[in-house]
């Protein structure tokens, strides 16, 4: 099963979403445990670690999309490794 497409694919999308919803960097990034300065670096095109991308999806996607990602992660963790 393929992983669900994450809601953000670029720093520009993240910044636009944050501004559209009237949040400052501290509010937006704090929801996923990232400092304002860390969020600022991510919004300046620094690579965003996959765990942070996943948290952003869970925090800001619709409930249905968030649940699909969590379900996928749970199944992925419990599926046997091929050849093991």
Model regions: which residues?
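A short, Lys/Arg-rich alpha-helix, primarily the initiator
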Residues: 1-20
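Alpha-helix N-cap/helix-initiation sites
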Residues: 7, 25, 48-49
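A general alpha-helix detector
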Residues: 13, 38, 54-55
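Short alpha-helical DNA-recognition segment
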Residues: 22-40
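DNA major-groove recognition helix of helix-turn-helix/homeodomain DNA-binding modules
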Residues: 48-69
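Short, charged recognition helix plus adjacent turn
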Residues: 64-84
